[in-house]
Amino acid sequence: MSASEAQVIARALFDSLTGTALQALRAAASVNGELTPERVLAALPEDAPREIRNLVMALGREGNLDRLPAVVTAFEQMTRRGGARPLTGEVISAVELNPQQRERITAQLTARYGPDLELRFSVDESLIGGLIIRIGDQVLDTSLRTRMAAIQRNMMTS
C-alpha cells in the first residue's frame, strides 16, 4: 500500500467517522506481537465504529495489516488539520489535450481517487506520445519515450 493509498483510505475514514474512530484506530495499531485481524479486532473498544472493523478485516485480507500504523498517522494528521487536504495529481501529455480528453481523464481519476483530487495538466513534447500520470507517490507512465527506452534496453541485453 502506497502513501497515497493510505491517504485515500484515511480521507474516507475522516469523512465518515468521529473521535471514537481515532481512538479505536490507535488501539488497533497498538497491538503487540503478530498482527492478525482477530488480535486487532479484540483490541478495539466495544463501541468501535463498523467502518474501523471493516478496515481492519480488509487490511488483513489483503495482507496489509502492517500498514495500519501508516493509516492511523494519516488519519491523525487530517484530524489535526481539521480535515482532509486535497490529493494532488499531474497529467503530463506529449501534446495539449482537448477539453473532452481532460474531462474524461479527470472523471476516471476522480472515480478512483475521490472527488477531492486536484489535477494539473501540462505538456512535455519529449514524451513523443502517451501520458504520464502522477497521483501522490504513484506514477503511471504510458509515454512512447519510456516504451522506446524499454525496447532499447531489451535489445541491448539480448
From Swiss-Prot:
GO terms for cellular component: plasma membrane; proton-transporting ATP synthase complex. Keywords: ATP synthesis, Cell membrane, CF(1), Hydrogen ion transport, Ion transport, Membrane, Transport. GO terms for molecular function: proton-transporting ATP synthase activity, rotational mechanism. It holds the Pfam family OSCP. It is a peripheral membrane protein. It comes from the Bacteria. It is found in: Cell membrane. The keyword Membrane applies. F-type ATPases have 2 components, F(1) - the catalytic core - and F(0) - the membrane proton channel. F(1) has five subunits: alpha(3), beta(3), gamma(1), delta(1), epsilon(1). F(0) has three main subunits: a(1), b(2) and c(10-14). The alpha and beta chains form an alternating ring which encloses part of the gamma chain. F(1) is attached to F(0) by a central stalk formed by the gamma and epsilon chains, while a peripheral stalk is formed by the delta and b chains. HAMAP family: ATP_synth_delta_bact. F(1)F(0) ATP synthase produces ATP from ADP in the presence of a proton or sodium gradient. F-type ATPases consist of two structural domains, F(1) containing the extramembraneous catalytic core and F(0) containing the membrane proton channel, linked together by a central stalk and a peripheral stalk. During catalysis, ATP synthesis in the catalytic domain of F(1) is coupled via a rotary mechanism of the central stalk subunits to proton translocation. This protein is part of the stalk that links CF(0) to CF(1). It either transmits conformational changes from CF(0) to CF(1) or is implicated in proton conduction. Belongs to the ATPase delta chain family. This is ATP synthase subunit delta. It comes from Roseiflexus sp. (strain RS-1). The lineage of its organism: Bacteria, Bacillati, Chloroflexota, Chloroflexia, Chloroflexales. The gene is atpH.
